[in-house]
């Protein structure tokens, strides 16, 4: 596939709050498990095997652009990708997810953590980005990273958790060690993400998947300062910055305070409600991914409701409120993308009130 001459800037315009001829759309986890081509690859390769091979990884990344017509691609990688670079051994186990055999338990464990050198430690990430941007994509490529709290939760729990008790106990009982861990992870994230931008990523999304486990007061005490440092550094790169977390609607106002461009919402907080609470930056979201398993009439109606709310401002990007489920039909995503484009374009032209 050769890169087309016409570059689709719709996503970038919306991220900056500028006018575009239609509402841009992309989907979290659009590349991967819901696609037959990907499942066929997974019969032969593990996740890390795919992500370590730029040609394969680029293929998976660009599939949704070619098949669904989305307005942005997101790099196919795992949030755990950079952790081995600082001395954290990670294994992806089927049916479980990321597993860390030697969880963080002390200040000494944190002091042992090293620094990332992207060119040496994750060259395959940078090569994939360059391959996509220089040869294969006519839409912006979104790079990404996990956020400190979510990465720390895996490092302390040793894997996925339902309540994050060990993580929060560590945070409360060893604040100095916690602050050092946040600082080291922030250093890693800043260097890792800047390398993605230098390689050609046109926007960045920071995923804080599990930060909703914290109340607002604890977020402001233990997390918000380090997030401010991360976004302040990344803002110097002049690409749109997006923040997203699941079950964290109570933190949307705090995200809005950070030097970022786009506030990602899950399905629990309506766009109208978010804006009534003072969210004036671009909003991204927020169709409940479960709705994609419903009849098309339901999908269409719920999508209209979100578009009608979101399009009250030029700063709106249509997405799901979480990742695409494995059992969602690719045909549904293709149809949904076309509907968002057509409905929003007609609405912008005044055909819908």
Swiss-Prot record:
Substrate binds at residues 29-33, 48, 78, 154, 209, 322. One of its GO terms (molecular function) is uroporphyrinogen decarboxylase activity. Pfam families: URO-D. It catalyses: uroporphyrinogen III + 4 H(+) = coproporphyrinogen III + 4 CO2. Signal peptide: none annotated. PROSITE patterns: UROD_1 (PS00906), UROD_2 (PS00907). Keywords: Cytoplasm, Decarboxylase, Lyase, Porphyrin biosynthesis. Its EC number is 4.1.1.37. The record marks 78 as: Transition state stabilizer. The keyword Cytoplasm applies. GO terms for biological process: heme biosynthetic process; protoporphyrinogen IX biosynthetic process. It is found in: Cytoplasm. It comes from the Bacteria. GO terms for cellular component: cytosol. Homodimer. Belongs to the uroporphyrinogen decarboxylase family. Catalyzes the decarboxylation of four acetate groups of uroporphyrinogen-III to yield coproporphyrinogen-III. This is Uroporphyrinogen decarboxylase. It comes from Bacillus subtilis (strain 168). The gene is hemE.
């Amino acid at each position: 596939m050769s890169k087309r001459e016409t570059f689709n800037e719709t996503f970038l315009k919306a991220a900056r709050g500028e006018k575009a001829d239609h509402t841009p759309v992309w989907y979290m986890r659009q590349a991967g498990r819901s696609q037959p081509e990907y499942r066929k690859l997974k019969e032969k390769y593990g996740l890390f095997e795919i992500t370590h091979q730029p040609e394969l990884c680029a293929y998976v990344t660009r599939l949704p652009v070619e098949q669904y017509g989305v307005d942005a691609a997101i790099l196919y990688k795992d949030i755990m990708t950079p952790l081995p670079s600082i001395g954290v051994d990670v294994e992806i186990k089927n049916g479980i997810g990321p597993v860390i055999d030697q969880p963080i338990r002390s200040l000494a464990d944190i002091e042992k953590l090293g620094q990332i050198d992207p060119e040496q430690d994750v060259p395959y990430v940078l090569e994939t980005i360059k391959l996509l941007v220089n040869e294969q994509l006519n839409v912006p490529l979104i790079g990404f990273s996990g956020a400190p709290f979510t990465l720390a939760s895996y490092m302390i729990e040793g894997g996925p958790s339902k309540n994050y008790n060990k993580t929060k106990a560590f945070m409360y009982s060893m604040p100095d060690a916690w602050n050092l861990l946040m600082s080291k992870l922030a250093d890693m994230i800043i260097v890792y993400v800047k390398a993605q931008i230098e390689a050609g990523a046109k926007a960045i999304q920071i995923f804080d998947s599990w930060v909703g486990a914290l109340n607002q007061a604890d977020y402001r005490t233990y997390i918000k300062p380090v997030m401010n440092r991360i976004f302040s550094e990344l803002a110097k790169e002049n690409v749109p910055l997006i923040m997203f977390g699941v079950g964290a609607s109570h933190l949307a106002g705090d995200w809005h305070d950070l030097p970022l461009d786009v506030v990602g919402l899950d399905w629990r907080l309506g766009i109208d409600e978010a804006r009534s609470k003072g969210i004036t930056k671009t909003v991204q979201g927020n169709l409940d991914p479960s709705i994609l398993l419903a009849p098309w009439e339901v999908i269409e109606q719920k999508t209209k409701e979100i578009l009608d709310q979101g399009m009250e401002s030029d700063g709106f990007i249509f997405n799901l409120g979480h990742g695409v489920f494995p059992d969602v039909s690719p045909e549904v995503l293709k149809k949904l993308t076309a509907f968002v484009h057509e409905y929003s374009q007609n609405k912008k032209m005044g055909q819908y009130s």
